[in-house]
Amino acid sequence: MAAKNFLLTGRPGIGKTTCVVKTAELLVSRGVKVGGMVTHEVREGGSRVGFKVRDLLTGREGFLAKVGAGAGPRVGKYVVHVEELEAVGVGAILRAVSEAQVVVIDEIGPMELYSPSFLPAVLKALDSDKPVLATIHERESSSGRLRGILERGDVKLYTVTLQNRDLLPPQLAREIASLVAR
């Protein structure tokens, strides 16, 4: 089975999200409609205080996690905002499956997996006829929880490194654009 789902893994800070964003920009510049969710850091005074998730089709944002007290699951010093993740992130994935040509999911990680509707949305995207470009947290890519995703015949896994992170976006954009053009 040919790959139509492209997953990027690698150590934290190596450039997985940057690869996905650059690939999405290249696809958009070719006239491809890209949807889904991307995650970015929120910084205050030079310190990371949280993460926001953004819907690529609508531009809507919500907090994925913030430093501090509060109700909700914790990952390290962060409190995961499951409701905002579901409203913005899960909504973005499902919207992209129905409205876009390519689905972006950044990232499949420990924070996102606290949402009971996140993994089903990811699986719906992977099972769709749309190409998926996703990042997967390094620890999750080596754990049993997501082994079923990684062992799919339609998944191609890339490990992002300092050596390949600038080469991957044009390569991925070409591969994905060729799938959309069929």
UniProtKB/Swiss-Prot annotation:
rRNA-binding is among the record's keywords: no
Q: Where are the transmembrane segments?
A: none
Alphabetical UniProt keywords: ATP-binding, Hydrolase, Nucleotide-binding
The reaction(s) annotated as catalysed by this protein in its Swiss-Prot or TrEMBL entry are: a ribonucleoside 5'-triphosphate + H2O = a ribonucleoside 5'-diphosphate + phosphate + H(+)
Enzyme class of the recorded protein, top EC level: hydrolase
Q: Which Pfam families match?
A: NTPase_1
Give the InterPro entries listed for this entry: AAA+_ATPase (IPR003593), Nuc-triphosphatase_THEP1 (IPR004948), P-loop_NTPase (IPR027417)
Q: What is its EC number?
A: 3.6.1.15
Q: Which residues bind ATP?
A: 10-17, 102-109
Question: Do you know which SMART domains this protein is assigned to?
Answer: AAA (SM00382)
Which Gene Ontology molecular function entries are recorded, alphabetically?
Answer: ATP binding; ATP hydrolysis activity
Q: Does the keyword Amino-acid biosynthesis apply?
A: no
Q: What does this protein do?
A: Has nucleotide phosphatase activity towards ATP, GTP, CTP, TTP and UTP. May hydrolyze nucleoside diphosphates with lower efficiency.
Spell out the family assignment given in the record's similarity comment.
Answer: Belongs to the THEP1 NTPase family.
| Entries under HAMAP family matching the protein | NTPase_1
Protein name, entry field: Nucleoside-triphosphatase THEP1
The source organism is Thermofilum pendens (strain DSM 2475 / Hrk 5)
